[in-house]
């Protein structure tokens, strides 16, 4: 395999997104090991190189065609796209799909003593943020003028330090805000991790590998969202039991040895089977109910 046909994928060097990205690729059958002292990891079984970089470098590397694919938070991607559009730099990439991890929200927050009605309450005030472009777009859409205070980290301490009147920062549980005497007022952007691809023309070999990886990602995520359900059911309540299985399509119904009054049902459900549903199934005569995770799915 020539160097030009090796697929280059950028992932975050460290942090939760890095861990989840590595796990996703391994679930897709990509075998690799990470040396913390090196920025590049070579896959053992596929022509794939993983570049471990800062998260805010990933969109630019993909947009400039330095790497072929990247796994990145949508918030970081959109922040970079707005910045590049402002500077008339290449800002295009293909967003292949949203992933099932990296959930976060970008929110406005103010000190607990601040009387907040809506975003207009921040008119003319100073707001600290690490996402100036997303904040600017939101405030422009609202017709609100403000002063910004750009910080690369520890945004939540800005009001207490006298640097800003409020903040715009990523929020998960809100515990950090509370610890710093702040409260969340408004969500301006919701984000998940996503896979992006360079818009530059790929060789047929490399594009085939991209398509293979994406197909496997789709299968892994579909499997995570599904459960395999097995149970025994009386034939007289079969239709009612099948109707109770959440998200199940065309379950397999098999006869049981030496029992003409009961059957075995196998089904893939796209929703969780909650305890109350299992109790309803039991009330209809179902028994030996098993709900199991699915590792992989295809087709």
From Swiss-Prot:
Its EC number is 2.4.2.17. Keywords: Amino-acid biosynthesis, ATP-binding, Cytoplasm, Glycosyltransferase, Histidine biosynthesis, Magnesium, Metal-binding, Nucleotide-binding, Transferase. Its main location: cytoplasm. One of its GO terms (cellular component) is cytoplasm. It is found in: Cytoplasm. Gene3D superfamilies: 3.30.70.120, Periplasmic binding protein-like II. GO terms for molecular function: ATP binding; ATP phosphoribosyltransferase activity; magnesium ion binding. It comes from Shewanella baltica (strain OS155 / ATCC BAA-1091). This is ATP phosphoribosyltransferase. The keyword Repeat does not apply. One of its GO terms (biological process) is L-histidine biosynthetic process. Catalyzes the condensation of ATP and 5-phosphoribose 1-diphosphate to form N'-(5'-phosphoribosyl)-ATP (PR-ATP). Has a crucial role in the pathway because the rate of histidine biosynthesis seems to be controlled primarily by regulation of HisG enzymatic activity.
